[in-house]
Amino acid sequence: MTSKSLNAWVIHKQWSGDTSARLKLFTRELGLINCLCKGGRTPKKQSLLQAFIPLWVSIEERYDQYYTRNIESTSSRLDLEGHSLFSGLYINELLYYTLSPDFPDPDLFDAYLFTLNGIALAREREAIEALLRRFEWALLKACGYTFSFLHEARTGELIVPDSYYQFVAGEGFILGGDKEIPGEHLLAIAADNLSESAYLKSAKFIMRQAINHLLGGREIKARSLYGPA
C-alpha cells in the first residue's frame, strides 16, 4: 500500500452505493486519476467534491485502485458564472474525454489552473475565448497532437502571409483548398497574437477541427450551453 499527497481538481463525480463517490481527479502529480472516496456523501465532503475547488488530497493505492484518505480545500471555489462557468465545464469535459489516466503533465496542470483563474476574472467574451484557444493548444500538445503554424504540412515550405491555406485535421495546413485561412492569421496565431477578432475567429475554427479530431466523435455537452469552441 502506498500513500501520496496530491494537488487536485474534481473533474467528474458519480455516487457509488449509499455512502461513497467515484471521482475523476485532475492532479499535478499523477495526471487524471480515478479514485473512490468513502464517505463522500457526508455534508462536509459533499461541499468539497465539486468542480472548481482547488484541493489537497491524500490518497492510498491498493490493488491498482486509488482511495482518498483526506481531502481539504486549499482555497475557496472559483467564482464562475455565465460564459465563465460554461467555459470551465467545457475544459473539464475535454480533460475527461482526452487524457489517459495516470499520465502526469505538470505543464498542462499549470495551463488548466491559469485558464480557470483567467476565465474567472475575464469580463469580455473575447478574452475568455482567447484563454480557451490557448488551453486547447496546450491540451493538444499534451496529447501528442501538434502541427506547425509556420510551415505548409506537405511541402515544409514557410507559411506566406499573403497566401491562403486549408486546415486538414491530422496533418496541418495545406496551400489552397475550400475553407481557406489567410497565412497572416496563421503567423499571428503562431506568435500567440489573438488580439484581433479575425485572428481569434481563425484560431477558433482551427482548434474546433483539431479538438474534434482528438475527440474521435465524442460529444462535448458544454458546447450546447455556450459553444466556446
UniProtKB/Swiss-Prot annotation:
- Biological process annotations from GO: DNA recombination; double-strand break repair
* Metal-binding found in the keyword field: no
GO annotations of cellular component type: bacterial nucleoid
Q: Does the keyword DNA repair apply?
A: yes
Q: Which Gene3D superfamilies match?
A: Nucleic acid-binding proteins, Recombination protein O, C-terminal domain
Instruction: Write out the entry's keywords from A to Z.
Output: DNA damage, DNA recombination, DNA repair
Family annotation (InterPro entries): ARFGAP/RecO (IPR037278), DNA_rep/recomb_RecO_N (IPR022572), NA-bd_OB-fold (IPR012340), RecO (IPR003717), RecO_C (IPR042242)
Member of which family? Belongs to the RecO family.
Query: What does the UniProt record say this protein does?
Result: Involved in DNA repair and RecF pathway recombination.
The name this protein carries in UniProt is DNA repair protein RecO
| Native source species | Legionella pneumophila subsp. pneumophila (strain Philadelphia 1 / ATCC 33152 / DSM 7513)
